[in-house]
Design a protein with these regions (language model features):
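Short alpha-helical segments enriched in small residues
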Residues: 1-140
Length: 140
């Protein structure tokens, strides 16, 4: 956890516009810090559209933010199922236009899945902020 915040805070001057991040690896943390209903977690599992929607809404509310991103996924090597294989990642973005979500299935090892997730999260967040579809490629 924390890859998006790490990437953002590597940018000089990010303290002018980046307030905070929430690393809610455990379901209990999602519930306690982001107000994700326990029933939602039980019904859908952490890696689901419903849960990332609740996560991003909770993050935006708790931070008083205009923009937020939430990620929940299975980076591997274990933890995957037939319905949610390793590499499954759900994203949600909060903006003045509302909440949007995407599901991606990434290939590669744990590090590759996490890096791809950070890239998508930041690129789409920049798109929401700037309204521009073209962003500079991000690399570690």
């Amino acid at each position: 956890g924390g890859g998006v915040a790490t990437a953002i805070t590597e940018i000089a001057g990010s303290s002018q516009w980046f307030s905070r991040g929430f690393i809610t690896y455990a379901n209990q943390a999602k519930h306690e810090m982001l107000n994700v209903p326990e029933e939602l977690l039980s019904a859908h599992g952490a890696v689901s559209e419903a849960v990332v929607r609740a996560m991003v809404a909770g993050a935006a509310q708790e931070a008083g933010a205009d923009y937020a991103v939430a990620i929940s996924g299975i980076a591997g090597p274990g933890g995957g199922t037939e319905a949610k294989p390793v590499g499954t990642v759900w994203f949600a973005w909060f903006s003045p236009q509302g909440i949007s979500t995407q599901e991606h299935r990434f290939m590669g090892d744990r590090i590759a899945v996490r890096q791809q997730a950070v890239k998508i999260a930041i690129e789409e967040l920049l798109h929401k902020i700037t309204g521009c579809n073209t962003v500079q490629p991000y690399s570690y």
